[in-house]
Amino acid sequence: MPRAKGGFKSRQRRNKVLKLAKGYRGARSKLFRSATEAVDRALNYAFRDRRVKKRDFRSLWIMRINAASRLNGLSYSKFIFGLKKADVQIDRKVLADIAITDPKGFAEISAVAKAQL
């Protein structure tokens, strides 16, 4: 029985990695070993940054809410505390959107929060 070296499957596996590395600079898109390292690193960064993105957006929303609430005479922490006491259940994403698109509406929400303090 002749020896089977698994050439087809090996080539398939290499081509899969090289396809993922398409568009990388230099040897990283041409040579299997360099491509493997680059793809592994890229996938690790992608995995990590999908989680970091959530933190970054939340901090962006908080910055926007803080800036808008300070225009209405409240700090961020007092604004959020006032909303919690008033039982207003609007999340930070929506509050940040209102702060940018509808400043008058945000001023009304700030008035509700201020009344509870």
UniProtKB/Swiss-Prot annotation:
One of its GO terms (biological process) is translation. One of its GO terms (cellular component) is ribosome. The keyword RNA-binding applies. InterPro entries: Ribosomal_bL20, RIBOSOMAL_L20_CS, Ribosomal_protein_bL20_C. It holds the Pfam family Ribosomal_L20. Keywords: Ribonucleoprotein, Ribosomal protein, RNA-binding, rRNA-binding. One of its GO terms (molecular function) is rRNA binding. It comes from the Bacteria. PANTHER family: 39S RIBOSOMAL PROTEIN L20 (PTHR10986). Binds directly to 23S ribosomal RNA and is necessary for the in vitro assembly process of the 50S ribosomal subunit. It is not involved in the protein synthesizing functions of that subunit. This is Large ribosomal subunit protein bL20. It comes from Trichlorobacter lovleyi (strain ATCC BAA-1151 / DSM 17278 / SZ).
